[in-house]
Amino acid sequence: IQIFNKDNATILTDLFDLETLDYYARKNCGFEVSKTEIDKYETEYRGGLQGDYSSEMDAKIDNVIDSLINYPESKRAVVMMNNGWWAHDDTDEAKCCRELHFFLTENYNDKTMLLNCSGIFRAQAVDIMPKNFYFVYKIMEVINEKLNKQTESKYLLGSYTHFVTILVPTRYD
């Protein structure tokens, strides 16, 4: 997706309305969520613990920002989703989203700086994909806002590339 924004990151379905997408994106970006929200939105089918990327997310985001500021041409700005070493039979730790790679490029037309992302997914159920697309948009937005606050540059959201090694129709396929 050449320019990733809220419009093209929002895919509404029976499983994911805008409120539900926003809840999961905020949670997975490390924002605080209430017990009421957890009870209202979280279901095993929507991803369960396997789709929970929030562990240590504040530190992961800070690391990306530090990398982009101090090594702007580097490829060190990576968020890894697993929480540590996991065994193949630990379903909750077998995160579908494995890594998000962030990098900066210059827009050739107007020389603005763009924040881009490539997402690498171990597996992706098509019916869960809207949640992941919206999460990637949200984390890009969070990183972009923090970059703009911590630097004198003006960054805009750029491209998103979605890599999936195994694509299945539903979560239980």
Language-model region placement:
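Terminal, non-catalytic protein-protein interaction segments that mediate quaternary/complex assembly
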Residues: 1-173
